[in-house]
């Protein structure tokens, strides 16, 4: 820092000696080495100060502050100094004499000192800038836009005018710094068309970027986050720049980029691993509260247990020095880490109580969600939060805020609502988006469940409110005529309200807007259909048709989302073979560009539909790939880590059973044994009923085995064995008749044979009870994972009987005799 400061001063001295002095006063400013010297000059020469002097003095004061570490800056002292106030008055009096560059520079520098937006100088500079807007060059325009953002004028007519100028001059922009700055400033007032033009322009300029300037692509990614637009080609280019600069990034920059990626649901394993290594490397350098907070936020969710414990210890020692913003960041990270450090949770909760009144509604919502998730044991904090949240809700007129506050209030212990809150919710319902309505539905349902029976008036009000909410939801869905708007609103719905109340209306709208399905929205549309668990052939056929025709326009990583509803819902479209082949051929050349976990998910989804591309399978079951996968999973949350490992096991099992020619070894024995050890061994009342009926059908309870684990660790509800004459065989020797993987061998024809367990000609029968999860919402069609399980059991030599819950609970099977007859026909079928 000292060397830089000396160089800065020396460069000014050298510059001074090179030219013949034409402005002695300016020369005196140039040799100033501190704020005090600047203020002395200003005080002695107020009458002589020109626009140039004023602008230079203000800029110099900011440069002195920039040289200092954040913790040592004295912005408040400078702002309150009498000579700084004099500079502001002089600047305001000389605005008409400023050129465009000086005007914008003075506005920018004066805002560094945290002046209020209503400050007279700031207002006059902004007004003059508005008058000159059309003649600003792009550099001045971008800096002026940054100043407006800092004054919270993102959505102002003035910002809209800047966006219009950018729209007209975009072809002339050749500087990524200027473009990225403008993109971040004007994002809130641009059309989809201008958004696409900005993205295309950024895409072309990133290729020409000096890779050391990582702040420019960071702002581009920030723009994409602000627009909620995951445009992967541009994200990957920006990520490439970040990868080349990770070694130079500090925790703050890494934390920002990681947060942006999370918001965009963009994963890059290489960046996460490099970022984690860099953050661990900088741990010892982060000794102050500000840097350690950023380190904790970035590294905590990706760190192993030892590093986490060290980070938590550091936070405990610094917590008392943290400001409200830092405490909020720490709490959010603790939630993401699934922190169970009760001492740290209690400490942060206690400190938060001092600042609750200073937080904005959205921040209070985050605090409430976090302390509920972390199971905070501080009743005083919950009580204070409830009072503040209720007060804010009653005074708010913004639908999004009311719905958000209602949702978080409903999560508080023993939450109660009064008539004023219900009245407020009732008033804003017609203005709510689908995501707002879903939040309110979640809150109202919770209030109904916790409402005391004696409060009948409130209970009735809640019921009527829920009915009105459902009506508003149906009306809003019916009015939407743009599929992209429809998908955007549905993306942020929470809870079961949509699936339980509005599902048919939603699917009807999908059918109504089906002609608007294009390659641009196919992946998002497919993900939504998967989420609904609703098999609509018309919609799925359209997705398959558009994807097949325009597969080259869809980003290769989006093929997973595009395929998902077909494999999950077990639906084969009319052009099924062409559709699957087009998707497979599209992503195969890019396998090395996929994150490891996505390759596993993609391979598993194809396995559900009986597609096993050899290149994909060999890529997964490769020592180097599995090593990269393990490294990536270490940076994931425990839930996502477990999900990917489960899918890898299921893929390994599917390949071993269905594609023995690939000669992929089975290496999940220990993993499956651990899963089996943790599993809940209880059975449901329906399963208990079926077991008793099987005893009557087969001749005794010892003829049917419950909760059987097969080779390759498929869990089946019941197993029985029939001899070659279809006579039941009792389980006399459990050790002999239980399936044993060591006795399983490949037969000549491919299927697995168990060589020593069964008498000649005997047949194992697997009996499975399929509850509603095994079917789509509107169909008796069995979903993909249950179809795959049946295939595997048949390969293992089982005759598989799948009992559908809707059949078992139907009117036709409402008596014991009917159930017995149903089971007997299925078990002793002719094809057994």
From Swiss-Prot:
<comment type="similarity">
    <text>Belongs to the FAST kinase family.</text>
</comment>
<comment type="function">
    <text>May regulate the stability of some mitochondrial mRNA species.</text>
</comment>
<dbReference type="InterPro" id="IPR050870">
    <property type="entry name" value="FAST_kinase"/>
</dbReference>
<dbReference type="GO" id="GO:0044528">
    <property type="term" value="P:regulation of mitochondrial mRNA stability"/>
</dbReference>
<protein>
    <recommendedName>
        <fullName>FAST kinase domain-containing protein 1, mitochondrial</fullName>
    </recommendedName>
</protein>
<dbReference type="Pfam" id="PF08373">
    <property type="entry name" value="RAP"/>
</dbReference>
<feature type="domain" description="RAP">
    <location>
        <begin position="765"/>
        <end position="825"/>
    </location>
</feature>
<keyword id="KW-0496">Mitochondrion</keyword>
<keyword id="KW-0809">Transit peptide</keyword>
<dbReference type="Pfam" id="PF06743">
    <property type="entry name" value="FAST_1"/>
</dbReference>
<dbReference type="InterPro" id="IPR013579">
    <property type="entry name" value="FAST_2"/>
</dbReference>
<dbReference type="InterPro" id="IPR010622">
    <property type="entry name" value="FAST_Leu-rich"/>
</dbReference>
<dbReference type="Pfam" id="PF08368">
    <property type="entry name" value="FAST_2"/>
</dbReference>
<dbReference type="GO" id="GO:0005739">
    <property type="term" value="C:mitochondrion"/>
</dbReference>
<dbReference type="InterPro" id="IPR013584">
    <property type="entry name" value="RAP"/>
</dbReference>
């Amino acid at each position: 820092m000292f060397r830089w400061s000396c160089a800065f001063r020396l460069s000014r001295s050298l510059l001074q000696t090179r030219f013949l002095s034409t402005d002695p006063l300016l020369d005196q400013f140039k040799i100033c080495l501190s704020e005090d010297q600047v203020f002395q000059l200003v005080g002695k020469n107020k009458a002589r100060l020109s626009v140039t002097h004023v602008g230079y003095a203000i800029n110099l004061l900011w440069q002195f502050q920039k040289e200092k570490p954040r913790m040592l800056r004295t912005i408040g002292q400078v702002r309150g100094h009498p000579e700084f106030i004099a500079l502001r008055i002089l600047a305001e009096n000389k605005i008409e004499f400023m050129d465009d560059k000086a005007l914008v520079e003075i506005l920018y520098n004066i805002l560094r000192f945290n002046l209020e937006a209503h400050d007279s100088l700031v207002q006059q500079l902004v007004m003059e800038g508005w008058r000159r807007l059309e003649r600003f060059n792009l550099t001045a325009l971008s800096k002026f836009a940054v100043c407006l953002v800092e004054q919270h004028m993102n959505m102002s007519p003035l910002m809209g005018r800047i966006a219009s100028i950018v729209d007209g001059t975009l072809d002339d922009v050749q500087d990524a710094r200027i473009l990225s700055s403008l993109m971040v400033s004007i994002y809130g007032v641009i059309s989809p068309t201008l958004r696409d033009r900005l993205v295309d322009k950024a895409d072309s300029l990133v290729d020409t970027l000096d890779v050391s300037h990582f702040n420019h692509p960071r702002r581009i990614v920030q723009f994409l986050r602000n627009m909620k637009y995951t445009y992967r080609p541009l994200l990957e280019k920006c990520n490439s720049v970040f990868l080349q600069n990770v070694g130079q990034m500090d925790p703050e920059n890494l934390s920002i980029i990681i947060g942006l990626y999370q918001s965009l649901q963009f994963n890059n394993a290489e960046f996460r691993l490099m970022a984690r290594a860099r953050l661990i490397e900088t741990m010892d350098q982060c000794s102050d509260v500000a840097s350690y907070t950023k380190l904790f936020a970035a590294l905590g969710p990706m760190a192993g247990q030892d590093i986490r414990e060290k980070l938590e210890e550091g936070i405990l020692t610094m917590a008392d020095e943290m400001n409200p913003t830092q405490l909020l960041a720490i709490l959010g990270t603790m939630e993401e880490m699934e922190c169970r450090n009760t001492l740290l949770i209690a400490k942060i909760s206690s400190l938060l109580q001092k600042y609750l009144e200073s937080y904005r509604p959205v921040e209070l919502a985050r605090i409430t969600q976090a302390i509920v998730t972390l199971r905070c044991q501080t009743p005083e904090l919950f009580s204070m939060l409830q009072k503040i949240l209720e007060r804010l809700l009653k005074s708010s007129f913004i639908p999004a805020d009311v719905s958000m506050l209602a949702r978080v209030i409903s999560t508080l212990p023993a939450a109660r609502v009064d008539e004023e809150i219900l009245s407020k919710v009732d008033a804003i319902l017609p203005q709510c988006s689908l995501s707002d309505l879903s939040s309110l539905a979640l809150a109202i349902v919770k209030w109904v469940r916790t409402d005391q029976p004696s409060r009948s008036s409130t209970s009735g009000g809640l019921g009527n409110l829920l009915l009105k909410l459902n009506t508003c939801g149906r009306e809003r869905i019916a009015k939407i005529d743009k599929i992209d708007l429809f998908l955007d609103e549905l993306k942020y719905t929470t809870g079961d309200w949509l699936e339980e109340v509005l599902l048919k209306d939603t699917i009807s709208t999908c059918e109504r807007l089906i002609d608007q399905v294009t390659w641009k929205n196919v992946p998002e549309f497919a993900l939504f259909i998967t989420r609904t668990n609703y098999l609509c052939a018309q919609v799925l056929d359209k997705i398959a048709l558009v994807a097949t025709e325009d597969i080259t326009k869809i980003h290769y990583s989006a093929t997973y989302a595009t395929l998902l509803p077909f494999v999950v819902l077990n639906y084969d479209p009319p052009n099924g073979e062409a559709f699957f082949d087009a998707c497979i051929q599209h992503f195969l050349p890019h396998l090395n560009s996929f994150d490891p976990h996505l390759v596993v998910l993609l391979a598993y989804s194809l396995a559900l539909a009986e597609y096993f591309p050899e290149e994909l399978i060999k890529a997964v079951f490769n020592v180097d790939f599995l090593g990269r996968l393990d490294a990536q999973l270490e940076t994931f949350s425990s839930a996502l880590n477990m999900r990917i490992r489960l899918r890898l096991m299921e893929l390994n099992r599917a390949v071993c059973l269905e594609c023995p020619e690939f000669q992929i070894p089975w290496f999940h024995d220990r993993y499956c044994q651990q899963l089996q050890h943790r599993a809940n061994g209880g059975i449901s009342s329906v399963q208990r009923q079926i077991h008793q009926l099987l005893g009557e059908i087969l001749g005794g309870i010892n003829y049917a085995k419950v909760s059987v684990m097969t080779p390759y660790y498929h869990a089946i509800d019941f197993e029985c064995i029939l001899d070659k004459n279809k006579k039941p065989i009792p389980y006399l020797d459990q050790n002999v008749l239980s399936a044993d993987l060591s006795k399983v061998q490949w037969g000549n024809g491919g299927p697995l044979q168990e060589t020593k367990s069964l008498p000649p000609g005997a047949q194992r029968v697997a009996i499975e009870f399929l509850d509603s999860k095994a079917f789509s919402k509107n169909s008796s069609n069995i979903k993909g994972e249950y179809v795959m399980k049946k295939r595997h059991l048949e390969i293992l030599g089982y005759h598989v009987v799948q009992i559908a819950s809707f059949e078992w609970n139907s009117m036709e099977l409402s008596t014991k005799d009917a159930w017995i007859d149903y089971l007997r026909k299925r078990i002793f079928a002719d094809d057994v």
